[in-house]
């Protein structure tokens, strides 16, 4: 997929020379299969592949801005980027901004992760006081009451990849991850070193939102995303990385 992504990036940067770019936000804490970045730019992954295809179909060059999670809201508010994907309104602080939302395009399952020696099923509320691996600036609604009450304690890392690596290294007994990142992480380790989901924390559909600005073809972007979803194009991109079809729940309700 890396060579294909490189070709798409060249297409996006060369075929529309001189035109206004469509600026996409990429979160620096994401891990594969969502995105892999090198020298501040994405080189492969589900999200940049979808974004590049979207920009090409809209007729604009794709431009990527890799940002810290804490900077994403301000970047959208200040017009530094035009489109943000793999997101739900719950994660956006300024919900009163002039934004337009797509239908759900992706399905995310957040899981509590343990090691091969962990119990097969865990109830978070019954765990003794201990740190849990989390990603800096990420919110975890299911676990938040346990964090607030001091029952569990966040141990933040800058990326999802780092969270899982610290779990495997024994820095803590449990961590939080989405299913995609967990499956990708496990592909690089033998069975006795693989991590496993011990509890499902939350499942939800995620989409994209666009700045409602006269200089951006927002409605055309949303129509194109809908077409890409209903035609199976987005699901085919996901399957090329994950090896399995996307859950039908992703397109069932608006975010």
Kindly label every feature range from the protein language model.
Residues 61-68, 151-166, 199:
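Short beta-strand-to-loop elements that line the ligand-binding cleft
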Residues 74, 86-96, 173-202:
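A ligand-binding cleft/hinge motif common to bilobed small-molecule-binding domains
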Residues 18-97, 134, 156, 221, ...:
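Extracytoplasmic small-molecule ligand-binding "clamshell" domains
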Residues 28-30, 106-111, 187-226, 244-255:
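Periplasmic-binding protein-like
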Residues 114-132, 218-219:
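Flexible hinge/capping segments at coil-to-helix
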Residues 22-28, 101-122, 136, 208-211:
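Hydrophobic/proline-rich hinge and linker segments of small-molecule sensing/allosteric domains
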């Amino acid at each position: 997929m890396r060579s294909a992504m490189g070709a798409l990036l060249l297409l996006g940067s060369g075929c529309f020379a001189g035109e206004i770019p469509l600026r996409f936000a990429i979160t620096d804490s994401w891990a594969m299969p969502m995105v892999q970045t090198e020298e501040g730019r994405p080189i492969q992954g589900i999200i940049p592949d979808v974004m590049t295809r979207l920009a090409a179909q809209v007729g604009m060059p794709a431009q990527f801005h890799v940002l810290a999670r804490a900077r994403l809201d301000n970047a959208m508010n200040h017009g530094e980027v035009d489109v943000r994907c793999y997101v739900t309104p719950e994660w956006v602080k300024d919900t009163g901004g002039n934004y337009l939302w797509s239908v759900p395009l992706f399905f995310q399952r957040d899981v509590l992760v343990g090691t091969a020696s962990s119990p097969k099923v865990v109830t978070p509320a019954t765990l003794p006081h201990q740190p849990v691996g989390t990603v800096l600036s990420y919110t975890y609604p299911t676990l938040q009451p346990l964090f607030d009450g001091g029952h569990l304690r966040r141990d933040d890392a800058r990326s999802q990849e780092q969270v899982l690596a610290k779990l495997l290294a024994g820095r803590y007994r449990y961590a939080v991850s989405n299913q995609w990142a967990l499956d990708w992480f496990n592909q690089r380790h033998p069975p006795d070193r693989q991590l496993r989901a011990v509890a499902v924390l939350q499942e939800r559909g995620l989409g994209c939102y666009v700045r409602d600005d006269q200089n951006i073809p927002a409605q055309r972007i949303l129509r194109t995303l809908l077409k890409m979803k209903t035609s199976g194009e987005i699901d085919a991109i996901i399957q090329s990385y994950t090896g399995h079809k996307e859950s039908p729940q992703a397109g069932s309700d608006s975010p």
